[in-house]
Amino acid sequence: MAEKTYPMTLAEKEKLEKELEELKLVRRPEVVERIKIARSYGDLSENSEYEAAKDEQAFVEGQISSLETKIRYAEIVDSDAVAKDEVGIGKTVTIQEVGETEKEVYIIVGSAGADAFAGKVSNESPIGQALIGKKKGDIATVETPVGSYDVKILKVEKTK
């Protein structure tokens, strides 16, 4: 079975590579040192510091594994290859819910780069799926678990 690919921009991949380096060169050694110190306290059966450090080690190793997979199977998307006025990964899109006045701006990214607080939505999210391939002036229907709503695409531009 073929591995899943992770569409992303080159900048997203570079960000993941930096995160991976930080985990391997800083966080992993810190956790190993905490485990070593906690072991020195003696009886491991009731050693909460040891348990906490082992839990953190498992978390860090899981993050490392996840990032390595995403980087290994990264599919670099060139936003220039997508039509200038078409929504795709690496594009910034301004939308407005039909019947509302407030405008919203989103950057479309691969799933690895999603960050709702920074306005970066995954191409796999409900809003990302609704917008991909659409153009300025189009109406897109966003399907969510609690219902659907329509948005009008006001502007599409390459993310700076």
Swiss-Prot record:
Top-level lineage group: Bacteria
GO biological process: DNA-templated transcription elongation; regulation of DNA-templated transcription elongation
Keyword Coiled coil: yes
PANTHER family named among the record's database cross-references: TRANSCRIPTION ELONGATION FACTOR GREA
Keywords: Coiled coil, DNA-binding, Transcription, Transcription regulation
Protein name per the record: Transcription elongation factor GreA
Coiled-coil ranges from the UniProt annotation: 1-72
Family: Belongs to the GreA/GreB family.
Task performed by this protein: Necessary for efficient RNA polymerase transcription elongation past template-encoded arresting sites. The arresting sites in DNA have the property of trapping a certain fraction of elongating RNA polymerases that pass through, resulting in locked ternary complexes. Cleavage of the nascent transcript by cleavage factors such as GreA or GreB allows the resumption of elongation from the new 3'terminus. GreA releases sequences of 2 to 3 nucleotides.
PROSITE patterns in the cross-refs: GREAB_1, GREAB_2
Gene: greA
HAMAP family: GreA_GreB (MF_00105)
GO molecular function: DNA binding; RNA polymerase binding
